[in-house]
Amino acid sequence: METLDSMDKNKSVHKLKGIAPIYCINLDGQPERWEYMENQFKYWEIENYTRISAYDGREDDLSDIIKGTYPTMMSSGEIGCTTSHLKAMKEFLKTDAPYAIMMEDDCDLELVKFWNFTWADLVAHFPYDWDVVQMAIICTGDLHVLSLIHI
């Protein structure tokens, strides 16, 4: 049995109760990053997630997705990332869910421990006419993104 001293005092699975379906983008060649995400989902008792096999802009043929000339201002990695997000959105649109979360395999849910609100509280404060909400911490190091799509 877990004692009070050994428990994570900031963890409350109730914070993420009712969280939207998650579509997590992960390159096939990076299983350690998928394991990292699965460990976080397990920790927070999140079960409604789907792994999206990411496109590799350096190697994959994306001609079925990108018509015409590839964008010249984007790196092959950015093209792969963008098309992977489109792939995740297509999967979401096959469902009846009112909205979903698109995230990449480097997303860190650690900050949830410090929320003084729940997922339901957060969604309740979105503008009534919202379409997309992007939650991100942008730093000079790793980028962690959580996007919400509402149709």
How should each PLM-predicted stretch be described?
Residues 1-103, 107-148:
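An acidic/histidine-cluster motif and surrounding catalytic segment
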